[in-house]
Amino acid sequence: MSIKASGGSPLARPQLYRTASILTITQAEQQDRFLQLGELNQLVSFLNSGQKRLEVADILTKNANILVARAADKIFVGGSAISYLERPQAAVIIAGDQSSQDKINELSGNIQGDFGQSFRSLFNAGGATPPGFKPINVLRYGTTRMRKSLRDLDWFLRYLTYAIVSGDPNILSVNIRGLRELIDNACSSAAAIVALREMRRTALLIFEEDIKGQDLVKEYFNVVISEFEAPSLTDKLRKRISGDLQGLRLPQTYVQAGVSTPRFVMKPSLSADEKNIVVKACYRQIFERDIAKAYDLSLSNLESQVKNGQISIKEFIRSLGTSSIYRKQFYEPFVNSRALELAFRHFLGRGPSSLEEFQKYFAILSSTGLSGLVNALLNSSEYTDYFGEETVPYFRNLGEEPQECRNWGPQIDLLTYSAPFRKVPQFITLFSDYKQSLPDQHPYGIGNDPLSIQFGAIFPKENKDPRKRQALFGKDTRRILVRRGPGIYNQISNPQVRPKSAGSLGPKIFKLSNALIKSDSSQNFENSVEVVTKVAYLRVFGREVYQEEKLILKPIESQLKDNQITVREFVRQLAKSSIFRSLYWEPLYICKAIEYIHNRLLGRPTYGRQEINKYFDIAYKQGYYQVIDTIIDSSEYTETFGDNTVPYERYSTPAGVALRSLRPGIIDQRFKKVIASKSARFVELGTVKEMRSSNDIQSRISQGVTSLRDQSIVFEVNSDSNKEMLEQALRAAYRQIFERDLNSFSVGGEFLDIKSAFLNRQICVKELVEKLALSELYGKEFYQPYPNTKVIELGTKHILGRAPNNQAEIRFFNQILASKGLSAFISNLVESVEYNAVYGKDTVPYRRFPTLPAANFPNTETLYNRLTKQDISIVVPSFKKVLGNQ
């Protein structure tokens, strides 16, 4: 396998054991259904017995020392075995509880030299003694082995309590099966069996008066002993038929610990409900959802055939894979490479294993299409071996069978729920990376390289680009770093030029020279120290320090000014300060923190794993301060900066160099660079460039303003209005609402009643407008012939005297029209805050924006100048799409 690429290592947490609740819920979740009555009863039974289980586990924990002591005395002679039990592993005994300690001593007994009595006690315990058992002498066995043996006995008891609390003996089966061979290699498994039986007998005596507790303890102790006596399980092998595929094995404990994927098999003897469950499992595997439940879709013809036994499950899967639903969901939206990966997921329950396998099926997909790929997968010998004719395909993921390491990451990602949302192919990209050289990035991920900017430790996020690629860097792999200055001064090819300055091609170097220190001009020296101090702050912290932080660093500055410490020691103290540590050590991962510190203090990133692993080891074993000392006391720091030079950047990554430079290749050449003007654009455009006369100015002032503004008449009714004025207001209301005068038409009694009520002052102008708009004539002329959007435009024109303000207003009134009808729409307009503020109760509505300026003047102008009966098109608002306008 190539060492130049890696499939990555996504977070995988294989299940270590099962519990009663996890097993029940997971099985229902895998089948996409609710819990059945029997499963609910199991959960109820488990929860009801929870208090009893906790009580039994608590009693066993409190008597752990007694149980371990009796078991140890059963197999050890010639000393006090319980004394070898390490306190952190044992049950806690309350200090001063002399009765508990006396009971342990009483149960342990003084068996030093009473070998015969201990040997005879074996035959009084009940049960056959395992063949090959001999009591073990404590002194000959040794202190180290005694501690391990007592630790193991305590371990058995602790895991017994875990299983009792979880309600499932699976944790015992997973962890105890196979220990017999391991203990046989160290001491004697027969002695362990005797000790476990004695522990069981003592525990049953403790629960002698509690029948339920005794049954519970006996059940789980029997599992412990039976699993220990049973032979270890063989590994689960995954044989391959091709030389380019990996042969793999998986320990059976992983299979036992997890919840196995359910197998759905179609049999003629199944009931109708069971056959429906199998069909739904096919839908979930191929379409990743139950299409009958989610979209109310079903392939009734195929379903009836598979239920009646006319076609097998394999042929049913073939029909689903070649259906139009599958084609639209998992073939047409993707490129062929990704469609191939998803087909492997759906029909074989795994991802492509090798480049050769990928090329084989990619050629089939390219030449014969989706149907050819589905047929090739279903006709393969692998499908026949795993699923046959009657079994629904299932995911062969982690815990189900061994996984390949070369496509570990993409395989786990492919079997997740979000796989269809990823458009970029993973496997072919990984397989191509096997043959490519290593990328130029940090050995522990590109996200560990700080961005090459001045301020602080800013690291790029790797989760923004889904096409991230991992690479397997070896310890001897070294990164390519770009030298600041002439390439001939690179320290890899020429280490002797480390202290040599790069001159004008390199960074600015600040150095506190000895000549300046010895100078008589103290003023120059003070200025020099201030400059060096400020530059050191910028280099180490990435920014200037705050006033409160300066108070903390003041003593260190004073020592530098008094020539008590060198610049090198000054940098060391800054890196060890609480300010630096709180910024760039405590909140970051160790890898990122070391990379930042190394870059700031030595002026370059790390070369590779070999260098950064050294700092990992120092940080773990000796702490943070030793990491700083190791960097500053290194020969590279001494040769490059000496004692009086502030560290500066010497090397950068290629990505950092590209980040700082503006290359012509990345600039869009279609547009010329726009030079920003010094003055605002509206000032420049508004500047008068020619001489204007007074007549010219007057004509420009009146530009766009017509006589409509001066000629507009507002009809208002008050207490002094006579009958003639009331009739004028009534006719104005007719013209505003119906866009014409109604006197020349024969109208029914509805308008006569409204006219009479208004002239007799029984209703106000506002009520008059509402009654006119709610009349049958208005609905016939302005509501029934038009769509809702046009009705809204006409309603705002007639009642509010303007066009709609924006799309949000149209959408609001559209909801009212659709749900409550015309009457609610008219009432909402008349009772609106805008109507009351503009017209009140006694003013007839009128056109409010006859001339500029007005925000919706263009729409209002178009709406009023258009003949309603001759043009039924909708006036579209001319506002831009901005927040609040949509």
Curated annotation (Swiss-Prot):
Residues bound to (2R,3E)-phycocyanobilin: C187
Gene Ontology terms for molecular function: lyase activity
Post-translational modification note: Contains one covalently linked bilin chromophore. This protein autochromophorylates (Potential).
Biological process, per Gene Ontology: photosynthesis
Keyword Glycoprotein: no
CDD domains for this protein: PBP_PBS-LCM
EC category name: lyase
EC number: 4.-.-.-
InterPro entries: Globin-like_sf, PBS_linker_dom, PBS_linker_sf, Phycobilisome_asu/bsu, Phycobilisome_asu/bsu_sf
Keywords: Antenna complex, Bile pigment, Chloroplast, Chromophore, Electron transport, Lyase, Membrane, Photosynthesis, Phycobilisome, Plastid, Repeat, Thylakoid, Transport
Annotated localization: Plastid, Chloroplast thylakoid membrane
Domain PBS-linker: 244-424, 496-678, 695-876
GO cellular component entries: chloroplast thylakoid membrane; phycobilisome
One Pfam family hit: PBS_linker_poly
Membrane topology: Peripheral membrane protein
Free-text function comment from the UniProt entry: This protein is postulated to act both as terminal energy acceptor and as a linker polypeptide that stabilizes the phycobilisome architecture. May have intrinsic bilin lyase activity.
Record family assignment: Belongs to the phycobilisome linker protein family.
PANTHER family from the UniProt entry: PHYCOBILIPROTEIN APCE, PHYCOBILISOME 32.1 KDA LINKER POLYPEPTIDE, PHYCOCYANIN-ASSOCIATED, ROD 2-RELATED
Protein's UniProt name: Phycobiliprotein ApcE
Organism from which the protein derives: Pyropia yezoensis
Organism lineage string: Eukaryota, Rhodophyta, Bangiophyceae, Bangiales, Bangiaceae
Gene coding for it: apcE
